[in-house]
């Protein structure tokens, strides 16, 4: 009986080792962020021709005070209704920004950050094809984009290495021939590297 209790104790120590909550968001810690979200509205079956979606990947590096530098890439696809069909607009952007730690709890499990980012990339409308299915010609052009984004992000630690993200952001981009502003919201995971 004693051997089994000792074995159970050793297993419990192994399972709960590495649970020091104070070792989070230290300077030079890095994490890979993977995000997915909706753009320019909420998805509904009746509005499926107007919806858009985003995917992103980035590297976050922490500084003093729990602030972060973020460097990454994002893909946004937005649809515009046209007769019985829809015309896709795609944006491929790179991002560099700073996220200021606004709020955190005492156990370092929950964080709220506000960020500002610079964006640059490329936009294509209808895959670069000017002629539509009914013979009409698109006047929109493909082109390079530049601008910025403001982000509000909530993070909660699921484990010491896995973080759940919830975010909302507004992008403002010039240079394209379609909409300038894009509101986004979504979820993501951050995998802490060290």
Regions found by a protein language model. Name each.
Residues 42-52, 65, 82-86, 174-182:
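Solvent-exposed loop/turn segments connecting transmembrane beta-strands
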Residues 28-32, 49-55, 88-94, 110, ...:
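Residues that define the transmembrane beta-barrel architecture of outer-membrane proteins
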Residues 21-72, 190-194:
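Short glycine/proline- and aromatic-enriched beta-strand/turn motifs that initiate or cap beta-hairpins
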Residues 78, 148-194:
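Predominantly the C-terminal beta-signal and adjacent terminal strand-loop region
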Residues 58-133, 162, 191-194:
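Gram-negative (and chloroplast) outer-membrane scaffold detector with strong preference
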Residues 1-29, 194:
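Cleavable N-terminal export/targeting peptides
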Residues 93, 102, 132-167:
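Extended low-complexity acidic/polar segments
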Residues 38-42, 79-81, 133-138, 169-172:
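Extracytoplasmic loops and strand-loop junctions of Gram-negative outer membrane beta-barrel proteins
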């Amino acid at each position: 009986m004693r051997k089994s209790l000792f074995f159970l104790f050793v297993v419990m120590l192994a399972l709960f080792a590495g649970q020091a909550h104070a070792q989070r968001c230290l300077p030079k810690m890095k994490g890979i962020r993977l995000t997915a979200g909706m753009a320019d509205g909420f998805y509904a079956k009746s509005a499926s021709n107007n919806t858009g979606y985003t995917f992103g990947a980035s590297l976050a590096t922490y500084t003093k005070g729990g602030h972060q530098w973020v460097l990454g890439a994002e893909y946004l696809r937005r649809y515009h209704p046209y007769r019985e069909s829809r015309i896709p607009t795609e944006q491929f952007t790179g991002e560099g920004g700073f996220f200021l730690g606004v709020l955190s709890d005492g156990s370092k499990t929950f964080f709220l950050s506000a960020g500002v980012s610079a964006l640059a990339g490329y936009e294509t409308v209808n895959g670069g094809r000017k002629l539509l299915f009914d013979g009409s010609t698109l006047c929109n052009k493909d082109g390079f984009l530049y601008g910025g984004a403001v982000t509000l992000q909530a993070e909660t630690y699921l484990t010491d290495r896995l973080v759940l993200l919830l975010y909302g952001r507004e992008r403002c981009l010039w240079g394209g021939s379609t909409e300038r502003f894009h509101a986004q919201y979504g979820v993501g995971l951050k995998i802490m590297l060290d």
